[in-house]
Design a protein with these regions (language model features):
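Short, hydrophobic secondary-structure boundary micro-motifs
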Residues: 50, 94-95, 246-248, 322-324
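Bacterial N-terminal signal peptides
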Residues: 7-15
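Short, glycine-/small- and polar/acidic-enriched structural segments
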Residues: 23-176, 180-183, 188, 192-194, ...
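Conserved C-terminal helix/tail region of periplasmic/extracytoplasmic solute-binding proteins
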Residues: 303-340
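Sec/Tat signal peptide C-region and signal peptidase I cleavage site
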Residues: 14-22
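Positively charged n-region of N-terminal signal peptides that target proteins for export
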Residues: 1-4
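Pocket-lining segment of extracytoplasmic ligand-binding domains
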Residues: 80, 152-153, 159-163, 169-253, ...
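Secondary-structure end/capping motifs
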Residues: 219-316
Length: 340
């Protein structure tokens, strides 16, 4: 009897230990293959004991709001939110840049529109407060059209596709696979610009990042470091096993493997027309933590210039009131830990 009680006690202790070891981290992403590495980290057990509670939330500003409210710890999203978070003091930090767009982002014009000049007075679809708006604004300015001369409508990708096909938007910015869907559905629609162009790829202006709440970084620093390592562990797995990795991502997002490969490619390498997925060492170079060179002419220590470009545009659009230094919105502590 005593042996049975002892065995029961050991089992209870082990169960308690297991429960404590499975520390939960709540994170979100929206439906896009570039964020799907979290599904690899979870399925392949690359999280160092973290239990990833992954939510798909299509509006990134909803995710940021949940982070500020303490209901999310981290999110993968586009890389322009740092200056807004710093200006509004919402308790969110950009931890690392994760990938530049290398052709997946496109500005598409409706049939019959062949120049930026024709967009004056027209509606263009973007995600306001997102990089799609900056990309559109840069292209308009470069082609002689001021942002005040068009009407921006704020739409997530699915809705932007509907707006273009339905004729309520004369132009829009899309990433894949949504851009190809529009081109297929609208004979005569044309691509006016994409993110393979030198000014966009060398600055890595269009790309993605990992954000964490300040409360998470400061209150659970070991978990923040583990989460960052988990992401890059998943990237390493995908680079070594792209076929299996893409299948896991497709399942997690409920995408076809073909749609995933349209963004990530099939061989774990840089995909022209898709994205360039940074490993942890490349991310460290871009974030200014280590010295080195990056492919495609991407600037080393490029996050500083990226911050300045996005800040300038957010001042123009009225999303921020102050031009703050990068250090107010970026915390590379978890990335430093992930390098060790």
């Amino acid at each position: 009897m005593r042996k049975i009680l002892t065995l029961v006690s050991i089992c209870l202790v082990m169960a308690s230990y297991t429960t404590k070891a499975a520390e939960t981290v709540r994170l979100s992403l929206f439906s896009w293959p570039g964020y799907g590495f979290w599904f690899i980290a979870k399925e392949k057990g690359l999280t160092e004991g973290l239990e990833l509670d992954i939510s798909i939330i299509e509006d990134p500003y909803q995710s940021f709001g949940l982070m500020t409210a303490g209901q999310l710890d981290a999110t993968s999203s586009t890389a322009e939110y740092g200056p807004i978070a710093a200006d509004k003091e919402v308790g969110i930090k950009l931890v690392t840049y994760t990938n530049p767009s290398y052709g997946t982002d496109k500005i598409i014009l409706a049939p019959g529109i062949i120049s930026a000049e024709q967009l004056k007075g027209e509606t263009v679809a973007v995600l306001e407060g997102g990089l799609t708006q900056i990309f559109m604004a840069e292209w308009l300015r470069d082609n002689g059209v001021d942002i005040s001369e068009v009407s921006f409508t704020n739409l997530i990708m699915d809705d932007a596709v509907g707006a273009m096909v339905g004729g309520t938007a004369a132009a829009a910015e899309f990433w894949e696979p949504f851009g190809s869907q529009v081109l297929e559905a609208m004979p005569g629609a044309t691509v006016a610009a994409d993110s393979t162009e030198e000014k966009y790829i060398q600055t890595a202006m269009l790309g993605d990042a990992l954000y964490m709440s300040t409360a998470f970084i400061e209150g659970r620093p070991e978990a923040a470091a583990k989460l960052t390592r988990a992401y890059f562990n998943a990237v390493d797995f995908w680079k070594a096993n792209p076929t299996e990795g893409n299948q896991i991502i497709a399942k997690g997002l409920n995408f076809s493997v073909a749609d995933v490969e349209q963004v990530l490619g099939a061989d774990g390498e840089i995909l022209k027309g898709g994205i360039f997925v940074f490993d942890r060492e490349q991310a460290a170079v871009f974030m200014g933590l280590t010295e080195g060179t990056l492919p495609l002419g991407i600037a080393s220590d490029g996050m500083k210039a990226h911050w300045d470009i996005t800040t300038d545009w957010w001042l123009k659009f009225g999303f921020v009131d102050r031009a703050l230094p990068m250090e107010t919105g970026v915390d590379t502590t978890p990335l430093r830990a992930a390098l060790q």
